[in-house]
């Protein structure tokens, strides 16, 4: 490949990254649901004409590492012409779990015509012009159908989890496909909110496409595409350099999920990380078979988790492009917890199993890089959904949230308290926004003081969040680290286990399993005490 100018490369890194970031801002500011506009449960990225990622926003790792497989599936199954938008969420066709819906659009020189709710006639010539880029966004919809509000319950197959959307056109030539939209909305709760969020995603794609066309117009198509290629190659070289600095060898580790909510049995995840020169192989052979409950991860999730771990080892100035994964091979045997076969239920694979994969790979690498790898963070997203009829309006509501916990202690610093870590990068819904949007009241929200694992550097403390329901509702929870604590490293203590309770209106208290659904009455409270991070090094 031709040589490049380092200064110009950095300019393009910033340009393409700013496109993805601005897409995220547009999505956040125009979305309707608190889960997107307040919690920022979305991600945006820019791809080249082959579907290779060029740049990502600083969004959700679990989305970003798996989104390339969604784009690949869309390109394999459909033709995305000018003004088209393809949607998908099918975990077995490039998706991850059903609430995360990905929208993808092409960018063709000289036109863009996706405007939500407005018809645009595309010039026929544009339909034959070559695609320059693709833009994609993924957002977690607070309900996508299924047996329980929030679509995060304990289904035993994917059919019970909600609406599966294979790669399909949601917009053609700038016009929303009303039949497709109606079909989706007929099968979800709070359909007006879902529709508004889909339209916000479409608008985000328009923003990204317009910005990319401005770059091409300002700097020229040839140079813009050449430097997209340079960004990918540069990322690959930097990742190979990072891997080459790890001592050659084979490093093994095991961790486990508590259970799948059905069998009560621990679910082991085993990994062998083999480093040879400037390449890495991450092999999950020996991990648990897929399970009946909703903790199964599809291959895209496992690749995403591995991508995140190795991304943490590379400097932040290295472009987050497809090149990062070129020197890394991931072996995830089909039919296991890390690469489940259809029709496995997968709601928790995205949010819980991804965290345990990260914990396990970091644990293996800690044997090779003892001075760089942190202790385990809380290792769960504490997924909480509450839904029913809002007594204030008589309309359906569906509340979804992940609750922060403790970060693992670092080799030179304490872990941070009450924060989202690893595969999530979201926020907790502000109490004011939560109470305005839902028939819920935040009774307590604080740091779980003293819960972090002790050590030379202390693990971050977990959080306490207590929410009262103001009317009858169904609550579901998918969480973990209730039986096996987040590990400490180098002599540091483990973090505290998480726990959750229902406090009934009469004052009685029921401790909850980590996974399940429960009926709530007006005045009942849900209390979650999240796990803390492990400590690093011996105290004193």
Region roles according to the model:
Residues 109-131:
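Short, basic, low-complexity termini and linkers enriched in Ser/Thr/Gly/Pro
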Residues 1-97, 101-110, 130-281, 285-540:
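Glycine/proline-enriched, intrinsically flexible loops and inter-domain linkers
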């Amino acid at each position: 490949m031709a040589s490049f100018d380092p200064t110009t490369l950095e300019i393009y890194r910033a340009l393409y990254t700013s496109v993805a970031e601005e897409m995220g801002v547009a999505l956040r500011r125009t979305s309707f649901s608190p889960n997107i506009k307040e919690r920022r449960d979305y991600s945006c990225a820019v791809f080249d004409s082959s579907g290779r990622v060029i740049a990502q926003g600083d969004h959700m790792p679990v989305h970003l590492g798996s989104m390339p497989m969604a784009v690949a599936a869309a390109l394999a199954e459909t033709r995305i012409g000018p003004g088209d938008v393809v949607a998908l969420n099918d975990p077995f066709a490039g998706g991850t779990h059903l609430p995360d819906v990905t929208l993808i659009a092409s960018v063709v020189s000289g036109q863009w015509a996706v405007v939500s709710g407005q018809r645009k006639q595309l010039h026929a010539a544009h339909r034959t012009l070559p695609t320059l880029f693709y833009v994609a966004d993924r957002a977690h919809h607070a309900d996508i159908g299924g047996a329980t509000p929030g679509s995060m319950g304990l289904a035993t197959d994917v059919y019970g989890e909600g609406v599966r959307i294979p790669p399909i056109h949601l917009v053609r030539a700038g016009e929303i496909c009303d039949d497709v939209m109606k079909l989706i909305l007929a099968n979800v709760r709070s359909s007006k909110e879902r529709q508004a969020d889909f339209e916000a995603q479409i608008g985000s794609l328009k923003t990204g496409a317009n910005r990319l066309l401005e770059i091409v117009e300002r700097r020229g198509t040839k140079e813009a595409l050449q430097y997209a290629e340079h960004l990918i190659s540069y990322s690959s070289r930097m990742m190979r350099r990072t891997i080459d600095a790890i001592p050659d060898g084979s490093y093994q580790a095991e961790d486990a999920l508590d259970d799948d909510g059905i069998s009560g049995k621990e679910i082991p995840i085993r990994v062998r990380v083999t480093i040879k020169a400037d390449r890495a192989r991450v092999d999950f052979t020996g991990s648990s078979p897929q399970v009946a409950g909703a903790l199964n991860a599809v291959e895209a999730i496992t690749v995403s988790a591995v991508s995140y771990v190795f991304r943490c080892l590379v400097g932040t100035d290295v472009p987050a492009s497809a090149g990062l994964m070129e020197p890394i091979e991931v072996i995830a045997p089909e039919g296991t917890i890390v690469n489940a076969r259809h029709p496995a239920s997968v709601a928790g694979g995205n949010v819980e199993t991804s965290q345990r994969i990260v914990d396990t790979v970091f644990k293996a690498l800690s044997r090779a890089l003892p001075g760089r790898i942190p202790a385990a963070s809380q290792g769960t997203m504490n997924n909480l959904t509450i839904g029913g009829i809002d007594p204030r309006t008589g309309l359906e509501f569906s509340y979804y949230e992940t609750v922060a916990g403790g970060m693992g202690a670092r080799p030179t610093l304490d872990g941070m308290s009450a924060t989202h870590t690893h595969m999530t990068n979201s926020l907790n819904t502000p109490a004011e926004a939560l109470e305005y949007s839902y028939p819920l009241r935040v009774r307590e929200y604080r740091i779980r003081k003293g819960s972090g694992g002790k050590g030379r550097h202390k693990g971050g403390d977990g959080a306490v969040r207590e929410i009262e329901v103001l009317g009858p509702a169904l609550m579901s929870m998918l969480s973990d680290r209730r039986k096996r604590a987040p590990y400490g490293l180098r002599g540091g203590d483990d973090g505290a286990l998480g726990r959750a309770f229902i406090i009934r209106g009469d004052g009685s208290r029921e401790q909850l399993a980590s996974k399940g659904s429960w009926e709530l009455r007006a005045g009942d409270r849900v209390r979650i005490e999240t796990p803390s991070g492990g400590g690093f090094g011996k105290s004193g």
